[in-house]
Amino acid sequence: DGTHIKANANKNKRIKKQVKIITDKYHKELENEVNEFREMNGRDKYPSDDDDFGDGNYTIDEKTGEVKEVKNKNSKEITVSTVDPDAGLFVKGEHERQFAYTAQVACDKNGWALGFDLNPGNMHDSAAFLPFFDRLQPMYHASIWCADAGYANNLIAHHVQNNNCHLLVPYTRPKGATTTFSKREFDYYDEIDQYRCPNKKWLIPWNISKDGNIEYKIHKTDCGDCPFKKECLKNYSFKTVTRHLYEDCRLVANDFRLSEIGKTIYPMRKTTIERLFAVGKEQHGLRFTRFIGLEKNHNFLALLLACLNIKKLALLLVKRERKLKNKLTSIA
């Protein structure tokens, strides 16, 4: 699981900074598979997000004659703290923003902390998980990774299952507007890779987005005399259904969630990782940082989790000693 730790930085002392977007190796693998899919369907490859188009181009406004800079599409503007530049701006709620760090922590079924990672607060849990998983999996060879809904996406499910593990995540509601004829009303046929609509017409794969979402479209003539046209199409001329390239992996994770093992293991989160965070925040200062900089806070978190493991061991030894003492007393 991941938790945010408030940074020792004033949120009003900040500047705007332009940074280059760098594609990680996991999204590059997805990008390669997307381009392979496009080549199979006779389409050109997508340009890589890492292609360097320079620091920006300039254009002249024809009306005013003003020279304007065109921002590079492969860069984005972020908010950086002048007090702690390593921290990231975390959007806590609708109106609350603060500089923070996000900690990724893994524990076993008994609540022992096994590993951790610390990142800027503006990094989502799903983005921080994959390198964290690759570092811990060779050490512990876990067969099941149980996480909250923030880790429930197709890319994570694909990567975890490729490493011979199960991803156990909770149910998440479908995103988007509620419609009468949603995606679940369309039957998918894996053998021919096509969807069938309630009117028994076929939707064929038409295109694929850079994110890996395949678009299935129906011919306009098939929608012309459809009795469900008004409810199904709304303001569109033909129906489109999307399916991710790794959606099969997500369905496997969903089936594992509904299995007896999944129903038994998932409730253990509240007594393991959630309890670990609760004890750390309420009793040992995990809610706020005392240092400035990623390295110092990383070292503090390592010491804190080590102390929590030692505390857990000490309590178990005391408990065992009391049981032994009571047993000897009853015998005497």
Predicted features and spans:
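Anion-binding and metal-coordination hotspots
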Residues: 2-332
